[in-house]
Amino acid sequence: LEALGEIGVHLSCAPTLQWAEWRKAAWNASMNAPLALAGLTNGALLEQPELHDTFIRLLNETVLIARAEGVDLDPNGQLQEQIESSIRATARNLNSMAAALAQGRPTEIDWINGAIVRRAAHHGISVPENQRLVNAVRARSLHGPR
């Protein structure tokens, strides 16, 4: 890792595999479904207040469930800024769920937000924003591309 750092490649190791999986889930769960339903690229999350509010609620619910699972995703309080930095870097990208909805293909909603809903139920915790988006994406999927 040191040699890579000397040439400008900076890597870090995740504390655990479970932490890395939850971190990826936080990224996907907080942005894929709202952008898919809106049919917009990643940057819209930072440009449109309503989408940004949804992003924050989804992120907070995901962090809560990860914590219930024994994983502290945001020990230094910087998770939101780190994800927003990634959003800025990929602002023009259309996520896979948005592409799937637009093309009438199955989405990964049950494996992303649906998984958070299931883990929340296991812990007796309500995640209304995740549940709302699971329902909305499923409903949109039934009606095909718009």
Predicted regions and their residues:
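NAD(P)-dependent Rossmann-like dehydrogenase/reductase catalytic/cofactor-binding core
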Residues: 5, 53-146
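Internal alpha-helical scaffold of NAD(P)-dependent oxidoreductase catalytic cores
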Residues: 1-75
